[in-house]
Amino acid sequence: MEPILQMKGISKKFGNVKVLDNVDLTLYRGRVLALLGENGAGKSTLMKILCGIYEKDEGSIYLKGKKVNIRNVRDAEKYGIAMIHQELNLVPSLSVAENIFLGREYVRTFNSIDWKKIKQESAKILHELGMDLNVDRLVKHLSVGEQQMVEIARSLLMNAEILVMDEPTAALTEGETRRLFEVIKRLRKEGKSIIYISHRMNEIFEICDDYIVLRDGCLISQGEISEVTRDDLVKMMVGRELKEHFPYECSSPGEEILRVENLTVKGMFEKVSFVVKKGEVVGFAGLIGAGRTEVAKTIFGFYKKTSGKIYLGGEEVKINSPRDAIEKGIMYLSEDRRNEGLIIKHTLKENMTLSALKKISDYIGTINFSKERSIVNEMIQKLNIKSFSPNQKIFRLSGGNQQKVAIAKCLLTNPKLIILDEPTRGIDVGAKNEIYKLINDLKRQGIGIILISSELPEVLNISDRIIVMHEGKITGEISREEATEEKVMLKAVGGE
């Protein structure tokens, strides 16, 4: 096989911390390479070096056998390397065609832009990807899956031979995921090479040809996917065997903590009723758009209910804002941690204590920094958050550690009920395992938990009961003992 890319002896330091140590990577023409490792293993740093976002400290990069120097993003693009980020880099207020050709517009004589040609070429590229999008449509009106195809179209326009895909299916529906896989297979047949970053093992074994595993900035193993098992890869990634992928603890739920009766928000969901007890995990399953997140945000006061009642501890409550919900003992962990759950340019410490300022302030509202430091350090130890210091900026942390900070922020309010919306999205298997154990710990403390997840095995194995939604309505409630993927999916698509 012919290598199209070789990265040899790549090392990188941030301050005194070595994040990559003598890492090698080989990518072959017309192959899909899975780049694996826990959050913080060095995957993103390695790819940012390849794409010209960071400069390497040591090592060499070879393309088609020739040594190259990639100093910036323009260099990477010149060499045919493109990265499709987890947080898509599109301009929402521009059209599909404008985004595809941004910075590469066709210019006529006298510097006027040839929009007709741009639209024709945009439609042609999208058609080749199996997409018949209206190229005049604004990107903000597209689904995440459609936006991703626009990103891929952009990369093909610049004749990219190497595509880096970072958690490409994290926010996609099942249908969009299947469409993406078809596109990847088509690109592979055309001789394109893809580096695929994902924590979803079933995807790795379906779509990838080769693998490379990093741990703590070092190369652990690389080879062909056909030569390893799921457990082999997990052990390489975490450096140990995870005895249970889903460490469920049986519990005896206590008294009722939350009751929702006929809750309705017009245009989102209607007549939703369910109960959550102390020390119980109630899982919410359903396809994207089923209304699960909307129900959660209404309970948390983000949306105003049209009708229905909410009871806490047997008493009806009025929740008009998230502040009301927090004061009544309800916390919500958002599915979108970067835009709703955290302020990424602020520090770990500032984010963690944001919802519990009263706890660290004196009677006139002045922050007691000694108390703040003590509480933050305690949470860092309790949740095993890996950071250089409490003053580290959130965007510098790995996805798993960002999620732990968001969870810590929830726990510092001493909630009676916590709503976890996609708590393990985009984090590695080791961090997932730690969050599952934390859920068990919360159960033991008698906290009621609502778990929303698009990963069916997660809902089935962590929940005590499962509520299924379809198009804004509850279509069934299934006990843990009776639940199977087939039963849940049947109700998730509106079946009986």
Curated annotation (Swiss-Prot):
It is an enzyme of class 7 (translocase). It catalyses: D-ribose(out) + ATP + H2O = D-ribose(in) + ADP + phosphate + H(+). Its EC number is 7.5.2.7. InterPro entries: AAA+_ATPase, ABC_carbohydrate_import_ATPase, ABC_transporter-like_ATP-bd, ABC_transporter-like_CS, P-loop_NTPase. Keywords: ATP-binding, Cell membrane, Membrane, Nucleotide-binding, Repeat, Sugar transport, Translocase, Transport. GO terms for cellular component: plasma membrane. It comes from the Bacteria. Its main location: membrane. The keyword Transferase does not apply. Residues 5-241, 252-496 form the ABC transporter domain. It is a peripheral membrane protein. One of its GO terms (molecular function) is ATP hydrolysis activity. It holds the Pfam family ABC_tran. It is found in: Cell membrane. ATP binds at G37, E38, N39, G40, A41, G42, K43, S44. Coiled coil: none annotated. The keyword Flavoprotein does not apply. Part of the ABC transporter complex RbsABC involved in ribose import. Responsible for energy coupling to the transport system. The complex is composed of an ATP-binding protein (RbsA), two transmembrane proteins (RbsC) and a solute-binding protein (RbsB). Belongs to the ABC transporter superfamily. Ribose importer (TC 3.A.1.2.1) family. This is Ribose import ATP-binding protein RbsA. It comes from Caldanaerobacter subterraneus subsp. tengcongensis (strain DSM 15242 / JCM 11007 / NBRC 100824 / MB4).
